[in-house]
Structures are given as structure tokens and as C-alpha cells.
Amino acid sequence: MIKHALFATLLFGVSAVSSPTIPPQPLPFSVGEKVGYDVSVDNGKKVGDGTMWIEGPVDVRGTSTYLLRFDSRVRIAMLTGVSHSSSWFDPVRRLSLRFLKHEKNPLTHDDVSVDMYPDQKTWKSVDGQTGNSPDALPLDELSFIYFIRTLPLTPGATYQFDRHFDASRNPVVITVVRREVIPTPMGELKTVLVEMRVRDPKHYKGDGLIRFNLTDDECRLPARIESTMPIVGKAVLTMKSENASARCAKR
């Protein structure tokens, strides 16, 4: 149950934010990708499972999209929490057209259903809320994770984006921290640690911080995700299975 987080000019620098244009590179993910996770709490105890995968192609208002999915389920004692997120991602323009989220646990119940209209830089939810997006290439909290995988991951680089469809959630700041080797149920993996800071008063009472360890290969699989969840507090998702190319992650 990832709590967000959560991308056209890209911003990068070595020790500070700057703004040269980055030429588009081939996407490191495609339809059919699937990653399974163990969910554990701060003391290492396993409390649940999660899955990220890509379906499609799916048509949204005449545009062929990748359907990005994330599901998780956690349980501590008699308390159970579930989360389901879906994002319809245009792989050509690299933006989101639709986002759905359902979260339910003993503390909260949250449903989000939003359509984004990039050409108008607007969005509309099923409950009637509307808003203006600051960028014509909007993203949501799930598609942002996939977008991060497309960035140059040079340690020390910092990126700043105003691409969350909800203007109040911007800016989103991405910092590439370092390369490191992490243990997983699949063995030790070479990764790049990336931190994502996003405004999220609803879930974090301010800025939220999510840490990703992306595999240091052409697939950039999220091998480890550290965030905060209701019920469990700080939670860590660690990759236990994946179906990527043999040249990625299997070391």
C-alpha cells in the first residue's frame, strides 16, 4: 500500500537542480512486466504481499495506453489493509490519462478516480471535483514511479518536477543518492538508491518521502520501496519475484 508518492522538460544536475533537456530514451518497461514483493515492517517482520504489473494496451479516449497496476495487502494482528491502484499511461507522450485508487483499512477508506486532459491541462474526478494541472504532461503517484525509471540515475543528481496532475502536490523532487548492494529473497542485487519527496498533507502532514532501490541495469526494476502505511507505519517492500529479461536483475 504505497503512500505515494505516488513527469516535456526534465531537470537535472549534480549537486543542485538545473534544467537542460534530456533526449527521450527507450522505456525500460513494457506490457507484461510483473514484480512481486514481500511487505515488512521496520523490525523486518513480514506482514503482507504486493504486486506491480503492466497490462494492455488499453484504449483511453482514442489513445493506446499501458495499464499500470499496484496491489498490496497487509495484516498485523486482527488489522488488515488493502490497496489497489491503476494508472493509464501513454507510453508515447509519457503521461497519465486516468488514475484510480482504492485503499481500505481500519483507520482510513480512500477512493480516487480521476481523468486527466493533457491538452487542456485540466483534470476531473468522478465525484465532480475539477482542477488545473501545471504541466501538459501530467502524472499520478503510480505513474511517477515508472517515470523515475526513465531518468538518468547519476548519484548526486537532483530533479524537480511540477508534473503531478494536482497542483497542490507539486513540486516533486527526485534525488539520486548512491549505488548500493541490497539483500533480497532473490539474492543480493546491485541498485541505485533514489529518494522522492512529494507534498502530501493528507497522508504525511506535509511532505512525504519515499525511497526506491532501482536495479542498476537497463530494466531499473523497483527492487526495494520504503514508505509509510496506515497500521504498520514505516513499511518496506522487497522484490521476491520478477519476469524481466535475463540480463536484468538476475545476478
Predicted regions and their residues:
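Acidic, serine/threonine-rich low-complexity disordered tracts
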Residues: 19-118, 153-251
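Sec-dependent signal peptide recognition
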Residues: 2-8
